[in-house]
Design a protein with these regions (language model features):
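Alpha-helical transmembrane segments of integral membrane proteins
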Residues: 256-477
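Gly/Trp-centered helix-boundary motif
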Residues: 1-278, 285, 430-448, 452-456, ...
Length: 477
């Protein structure tokens, strides 16, 4: 192609080019949004921190599957409040009331209940926290009484508790709630159940259900009001946030793994990681391979011999065993993987570019440049490189999916960078936890499809560039 405009027109003529361009734009936009909106230390601070995901359901499918189900599964919900709805003066003390509303509309029960308390501030005596639930049938259940206890009260400044990590109460396993529900059943329904039997039945069925004659519980749909009452001696005492976790059986857009991690966030973070690995590896490998190939073909002599023998040796070394070996020795850090891929990724391009340069070396425009006294460096840069540049660009794009697939293979083998979530790591953890045998399709299909998507994107671009690089293909079309 003689001009850039002709090359662009030729590239844009094929449908593969258009689809590949659309895919790469989509991949780039998602990667930029992720980098701008998610912390760069997401892997170490959140993804590898099980405490951060403790309130999520474990191994839950995505919530959108309810669209295809007649009997809807309970969606996971966290309902919170940061400000009291009411402050009441009790004469010498105060009562601050927080109200949470939960709309229960399912034929099944929540899988667990958790109450969460954040950033509790008090000045004098520790407050008392009480939590009640008012059901749609106006029956009241006391689910938690928590007298705040702390050692070494601060007399000069306010005491601050649960600032960095919230205080959690797993109500589903609370013995005091078992006793409270035992009393509730006797008082409201004249049913005598021991706390042990309440534990076996499950607190969720009793709180959100109506007892039946056969001993089962029928879900009671409607709005549930959760009242959080803080009794304190100082009006300035406060709670930064209260939250009630209603454990569901479906979660978010992509579900969760066995640690409760939101797979959607992990998959999103994998976009810029895949793009970084692919582009960094392919760009560096292409630069090294192109420079050595041009120098080898034009300079010739011992320089050509040394470069080609080194390229032959490196090109015949099996890459995957070396990747496994070096990542096992030096650790599976991202830049170690990129470095190894670059070191062993340049020879094939060097060999091909050299053969192209050998034919260009005897061309008229090169001989004319030599005749007017142009230096070897200028000839290689100004006359030879532009002739092989389209091919080099096509190879750069074609090498990118190889790097992405290599990193995914290492991660799948458990040798990836543990501090960064990648699609291969998600697949590896899924297989190690039996996701295939347990039917956790949402844990396997999305990362696998995204790996294929990223690889196909660059393959389509490379196929679109073939008519630009190879005039014979252009004429056939």
């Amino acid at each position: 192609v003689s001009t850039l405009s002709e090359a662009r027109s030729e590239f844009w003529r094929s449908y593969t080019s258009k689809v590949g361009t659309f895919f790469i734009i989509l991949l780039t936009i998602i990667s930029i949004v992720v980098v701008l909106t998610m912390p760069l230390d997401f892997g170490t601070r959140y993804w590898s921190n099980p405490i951060y995901w403790v309130d999520n359901p474990k191994a839950s499918p995505p919530a959108w599957i309810n669209t295809f189900m007649q009997d809807k599964l309970v969606e996971h919900q966290i309902i919170s409040s940061n400000a009291p709805a009411q402050v009441e003066d009790l004469g010498g003390s105060y009562m601050k009331q927080y109200i949470l509303t939960y709309d229960f509309k399912y034929s099944q029960f929540p899988s667990f209940l958790t109450f969460r308390l954040t950033n509790l501030v008090f000045y004098d005596k520790p407050p008392i926290i009480r939590v009640y639930i008012v059901r749609p049938d106006n029956k009241l259940i006391s689910i938690l009484t928590y007298p705040v206890t702390v050692e070494g009260l601060n007399q000069t400044s306010p005491n601050i508790l649960f600032k960095s990590e919230p205080k959690r109460f797993l109500l589903s396993g609370d013995p005091s709630l078992f006793r409270a529900l035992s009393d509730f059943l006797y008082k409201e329904f004249n049913i005598t159940y021991s706390p042990e039997k309440v534990s076996n039945i499950g607190v969720e069925k009793i709180i959100f259900g109506i007892p039946q004659q056969d001993g089962s519980f029928k879900p009671l749909n409607g709005k549930y009001q959760v009242y959080v009452l803080m009794y304190c001696d100082n009006r300035n005492d406060s709670i930064g946030g209260v939250a009630m976790v209603f454990g569901g059986k479906v979660y978010g857009l992509m579900g969760t793994d066995t640690l409760g991690r939101d797979l959607f966030q992990g998959l999103l973070f994998g976009f810029p990681v895949a793009l970084l690995i692919g582009l960094a590896t392919s760009i560096l490998s292409t630069i090294i391979g192109a420079i050595l190939g041009i120098v080898s073909g034009y300079v010739g002599g011992k320089t050509d011999l040394i470069i080609q023998r080194v390229a032959d040796i490196v090109n015949n070394i099996p890459l995957l065993p070396l990747l496994i070996f070096f990542t096992f020795i030096f650790g599976g850090h991202l830049w170690v993987i990129v470095f190894i891929l670059v070191v062993f990724g340049w020879p094939s391009l060097t060999i091909i570019v050299r053969s192209m340069v050998l034919s260009l070396k005897s061309s008229n425009f090169v001989e004319a440049a030599v005749a007017v006294g142009a230096s070897s460096g200028r000839i290689m840069l100004r006359h030879i490189f532009p002739q092989v540049a389209p091919f080099i660009l096509a190879q750069l794009i074609f090498y990118t999916p190889q790097a992405i697939l290599s990193e995914s293979a290492l991660s799948f083998l458990g040798l990836g960078d543990p501090s960064i979530p990648t699609w291969g790591q998600i697949l590896d953890y899924a297989f190690r936890n039996g996701a295939v045998y347990l039917g956790y399709w949402w844990w396997i299909l999305p990362p696998g499809l995204l790996i294929i998507f990223s690889a196909i994107t660059f393959v389509l671009l490379a196929l679109g560039l073939e008519p630009v690089v190879n005039p014979r293909l252009r004429r056939r079309r």
